[in-house]
């Protein structure tokens, strides 16, 4: 028996079937480095329009987790797709370097005995070490960027730039010193930003406390009574007994009704709506003898339960009726609403009682409780209230309460002297900051769109921004305050520039070692040099100033404004937020044009990632087992607008999808063996109809993908590429062309037409996947035929695709109908294989009973219909002639019948044909194969 294998154009490529990504990816990284890929991109992009994605800096502490990987991969996919779309898209990675976590790490490692200077020195060393580790991990993910020159908030230039940004805000009148309640952590010994606060359940002791009336006549008049018949008190309810020693007022709602309730021994003032529940809680009987509008009780004085001072009634809209008594006890030093209300009633800072120190211990001079830690003092306070007859009720509840995100310990509001950026303070020119920021939000694009309402709500309701911290490792607030007046030096902005110049040379240490006389001369004795440092959110929030127009000037045609900020949804209250405020304060616009928010990673059951649950996914482990491209494919396949599920099983599914895409690429490459585009590429008009359709379909898909990429809809990109590989290519086109590719003459029009289409598809596909499968795309690029540059990323979207001309007889709609018919035939062929009627599809002969229009369409292909259906014979018969055993299909106007061929099998093309053996020199093959071997070769027109 003759072996005809050598006469076939069998596929051949060195592109490996097995990806081996964990081993191959590091080699590709080395190649990118050796060719200077990032620098080459900057060179070829210098005259292109710019697209700047500004990197939100991760904190320089610890190994990267799956959230970091997700974030950096999303950014890289955008930068790569923008590059392919013709933009110069630089990517400068950054790191957030100052702040408490690093200072805390240094203290834990080296002890708390360190001097401030030594602490800063060790913090700088630690941050640098952490950055190197994280940098290696980010590069391993395939993230293209300026890794040799990243920005770091601890770089001297950036520290100096931050001081200059603060000076701009001082100059415009946004910065002030004030006493205000701020989120305070006893363990940090510092104020916390809103973004550093998290909520967790806490058990608290609630108390109902009676404050005896001090002005009985005024209270009686408020209730429309001539006098009070017995002692009276107003009752408050609180979950913070420790604040009672700092009570200075009582807040009620002006529009609620309040009742005077006779309980026998005394009269109680309670919100009318809550009388019944309160009396039940106190185990008392009582009756309402009078009611009054809350506004009538304004400025009625009551007495503190155990201190000799008054507590006046103030009106406040924030009082609620959900729980308690409808009366809120006010300790202005320890509650933001209380503080605002007391200030509205004329209380000055010196009047506000602040008995709790920075470590949570009452000052020694506080009567009864001096020297006690506030949480431990609660029982003593309750006991004192009981002793004086003021305690109405106490119980323990569990409720959501603010905690430090680092120490996981409860926080308090604590009024301290701090530096603030005023939200509603009138600047020297223009609108207040809140107004500016809200306008800027309207001018910003949000992806997803709901982010706009979320950020708007946060800005609309936020308090002034406390920007000062009492720590060592941070950018200093370089102010000099007059010792007598407490006022800033009149030349503050000028002095800040002098400090910035020193910091540019020596880092933040320059301020801390500075002798005031060096800048102030003879005035030095009149001023205090302050040692507060800036909130780390000010560090990262001003990168648009000290990075984009400073250390890494972007040279954007429209100024130092990023096109895109991209971070997790928590950054609406973090980096997006602080950047918006500083941008609007300095430049009167947001520092970004568009904000993209991604969700958090969860496991496949929707649970948060947690080491205790054992459901964390470590990027390093994925890189070393499956490869970074699998992680990148998972990111692209997942809708980032909500929670993003990831697990070993989910990543395995991504690996399966990857194999399908890789196998498609390998098929394309292997069938381009011997193809030289410079020599063999056919013009569109010389190609077969099916091949022209395949190129046209590729062009249409490319247009869709470009749009999805521009809208950052990567899951649509992934699904469409995957479906194209599996369905339109694998399930239709590539199956059909195998016969023509393998059996026709090596240099025949039929084969070169097919290879031309495969070449165009390959050139397009390798670019489509480049933003997602960064390593694999560049690997494929090395195996494509024809002259090419060193990396797929040095190119744009493929421009060699052609559209089917209008009026083409076998147009898109035609091939859609053919695909539907082929799907129906495939279904019946599978049934016949299952029933053992046929062994393989080529053993089948199919008769199509079609209505007139469909019959005419299918008949256009003539004998080539069998190649489309991949059967040994196919005939089209009028629908009316369908026998009873013809199978109905889902295609309207189509029935079909499959029978097993009775002919011999061709030993070369494997078709079962009547003419097998008709040529005496080749008794084992069909006449078509004989013609392809020794004759002029078969001619194909369509498929």
UniProtKB/Swiss-Prot annotation:
What cofactor is this protein dependent on?
A: Zn(2+)
Q: Which HAMAP family match?
A: Ile_tRNA_synth_type1 (MF_02002)
Task: Give a Gene Ontology cellular component term annotated to this protein.
Answer: cytosol
Location(s) in or outside the cell: Cytoplasm
> Which sequence ranges are marked TM in the entry?
none
Give me any GO biological process, just one: isoleucyl-tRNA aminoacylation
Q: Which family does it belong to?
A: Belongs to the class-I aminoacyl-tRNA synthetase family. IleS type 1 subfamily.
Instruction: Describe the subunit structure.
Output: Monomer.
Task: Say which domain of life the source belongs to.
Answer: Bacteria
Q: What does this protein do?
A: Catalyzes the attachment of isoleucine to tRNA(Ile). As IleRS can inadvertently accommodate and process structurally similar amino acids such as valine, to avoid such errors it has two additional distinct tRNA(Ile)-dependent editing activities. One activity is designated as 'pretransfer' editing and involves the hydrolysis of activated Val-AMP. The other activity is designated 'posttransfer' editing and involves deacylation of mischarged Val-tRNA(Ile).
The organism's taxonomic lineage, starting at the top:
Bacteria, Pseudomonadati, Pseudomonadota, Gammaproteobacteria, Pseudomonadales
Where, in this chain's numbering, is L-isoleucyl-5'-AMP bound?
Answer: 567
Task: Show the domain comment.
Answer: IleRS has two distinct active sites: one for aminoacylation and one for editing. The misactivated valine is translocated from the active site to the editing site, which sterically excludes the correctly activated isoleucine. The single editing site contains two valyl binding pockets, one specific for each substrate (Val-AMP or Val-tRNA(Ile)).
Task: State where it is primarily located.
Answer: cytoplasm
**Species assigned in the record:** Pseudomonas putida (strain W619)
Q: Which reaction does it catalyse?
A: tRNA(Ile) + L-isoleucine + ATP = L-isoleucyl-tRNA(Ile) + AMP + diphosphate
Describe cofactor binding as the record notes it.
Binds 1 zinc ion per subunit.
* Residues involved in ATP binding: 611
Q: Where is this motif: 'HIGH' region?
A: 58-68
The protein's UniProt keywords, in alphabetical order, are: Aminoacyl-tRNA synthetase, ATP-binding, Cytoplasm, Ligase, Metal-binding, Nucleotide-binding, Protein biosynthesis, Zinc
The record's section on Pfam families has:
Anticodon_1, tRNA-synt_1, zf-FPG_IleRS
Name of the protein: Isoleucine--tRNA ligase
GO terms for molecular function, please?
A: aminoacyl-tRNA deacylase activity; ATP binding; isoleucine-tRNA ligase activity; tRNA binding; zinc ion binding
What positions carry the motif 'KMSKS' region?
Answer: 608-612
**Residues engaged in binding Zn(2+):** 906, 909, 926, 929
> Which EC number applies?
6.1.1.5
